[in-house]
Swiss-Prot record:
<comment type="subunit">
    <text>Part of the 50S ribosomal subunit.</text>
</comment>
<comment type="function">
    <text>One of the proteins that surrounds the polypeptide exit tunnel on the outside of the subunit.</text>
</comment>
<dbReference type="GO" id="GO:0005840">
    <property type="term" value="C:ribosome"/>
</dbReference>
<protein>
    <recommendedName>
        <fullName>Large ribosomal subunit protein uL24</fullName>
    </recommendedName>
</protein>
<dbReference type="GO" id="GO:0003735">
    <property type="term" value="F:structural constituent of ribosome"/>
</dbReference>
<dbReference type="InterPro" id="IPR005825">
    <property type="entry name" value="Ribosomal_uL24_CS"/>
</dbReference>
<dbReference type="InterPro" id="IPR041988">
    <property type="entry name" value="Ribosomal_uL24_KOW"/>
</dbReference>
<dbReference type="InterPro" id="IPR003256">
    <property type="entry name" value="Ribosomal_uL24"/>
</dbReference>
<keyword id="KW-0689">Ribosomal protein</keyword>
<dbReference type="GO" id="GO:0019843">
    <property type="term" value="F:rRNA binding"/>
</dbReference>
<dbReference type="InterPro" id="IPR014722">
    <property type="entry name" value="Rib_uL2_dom2"/>
</dbReference>
<keyword id="KW-0687">Ribonucleoprotein</keyword>
<dbReference type="GO" id="GO:1990904">
    <property type="term" value="C:ribonucleoprotein complex"/>
</dbReference>
<dbReference type="Pfam" id="PF17136">
    <property type="entry name" value="ribosomal_L24"/>
</dbReference>
<dbReference type="InterPro" id="IPR005824">
    <property type="entry name" value="KOW"/>
</dbReference>
<comment type="similarity">
    <text>Belongs to the universal ribosomal protein uL24 family.</text>
</comment>
<comment type="function">
    <text>One of two assembly initiator proteins, it binds directly to the 5'-end of the 23S rRNA, where it nucleates assembly of the 50S subunit.</text>
</comment>
Length: 103
């Protein structure tokens, strides 16, 4: 199945402790059905000090399920994503406005 959410998309969190927060997708794992969104689902990771890094308690963004994310349209509202053919190219479009997300 084609990916409805991709790296670089602006999304809003629909459920969980970070409900309502907005961010940009930094990475997507389609096999696991999860994505990492910067500023969302932050956990503290304890890292050991090395010669290159100081170590300590570092915040890290953990993956969040794709079903808990919704794409933001140009109006800043959550929208579902659909696919349609434009010419010979398959493009994503916002179901609320009908605008093409990427050409």
């Amino acid at each position: 199945m084609a990916a409805k959410l991709r790296k670089g998309d602006k999304v809003v969190v629909l459920a969980g402790k970070d409900k309502g927060k907005e961010g940009t997708i930094t990475s997507v794992d389609p096999k696991a059905g999860k994505a990492v969104v910067d500023g969302v689902n932050i956990a503290i990771r304890h890292t050991r000090q090395t010669q290159t890094s100081q170590g300590g308690r570092l915040p890290k963004a953990l993956p969040i399920d794709l079903s808990n994310l919704a794409l933001l349209d140009k109006n800043g509202k959550a929208t579902r994503v659909g696919f349609r053919m434009e010419g010979d190219k398959k493009v994503r479009f916002a179901k609320t406005t009908g605008d093409v997300i990427d050409a």
